């Protein structure tokens, strides 16, 4: 592996997180020496760390994922505070997914999409093919029962997908990825939350200036005041951050 593709690990609350410097570094890491890595990508933000702290099952799923990375700006700031020499930047999951799809389209990597509403999923497929000529070898919307899971996993295995992205929200997507890997282990899995909705324009993402200032969370709160209860949970994370309890 070249130095460009190597990345240090930084531990927060006992979970090792990959320290990517920027998006090119992330892509070089995932495609080290021209070979796409296999395993599970999980985006880590403050809310997910809190959930992992309170729910042992969720923590076990996250801990089992090979590639945990700093998606939230608060997590990046905590890494920098705990490890002053760390050269780590936020790599937003939505941006990483788009970059991964663009690379997959360029290289002809087979992709399987899971999650979203049927119409959103169809629009996602159409846009991926039109924009980057992505080789989509199968898809499944998010409306399937646990009893239907094994048949889905068999489809994914038969498709030969090398990238499987799952948009079902946490922890559902982590459960699906974990279970699917038992049937189809030789692929890169990525949990992407509401990314398909953003990609197809059904949900508006914060403007770039808000993202660059690390205020995407505030934009979402102002756009969706109902999120206030979720945001209040983050006070506990702030205590961890400012008391060096990470």
Swiss-Prot record:
It is an enzyme of class 2 (transferase). GO terms for molecular function: lipopolysaccharide N-acetylmannosaminouronosyltransferase activity. Signal peptide: none annotated. Keywords: Glycosyltransferase, Transferase. InterPro entries: UDP-ManNAcA_Trfase_WecG, WecG_TagA_CpsF. Its EC number is 2.4.1.180. Pathway: Bacterial outer membrane biogenesis; enterobacterial common antigen biosynthesis. It comes from the Bacteria. It holds the Pfam family Glyco_tran_WecG. GO terms for biological process: enterobacterial common antigen biosynthetic process. CDD domains: Glyco_transf_WecG_TagA. It catalyses: UDP-N-acetyl-alpha-D-mannosaminouronate + N-acetyl-alpha-D-glucosaminyl-di-trans,octa-cis-undecaprenyl diphosphate = beta-D-ManNAcA-(1->4)-alpha-D-GlcNAc-di-trans,octa-cis-undecaprenyl diphosphate + UDP + H(+). Belongs to the glycosyltransferase 26 family. Catalyzes the synthesis of Und-PP-GlcNAc-ManNAcA (Lipid II), the second lipid-linked intermediate involved in enterobacterial common antigen (ECA) synthesis. This is UDP-N-acetyl-D-mannosaminuronic acid transferase. It comes from Salmonella arizonae (strain ATCC BAA-731 / CDC346-86 / RSK2980).
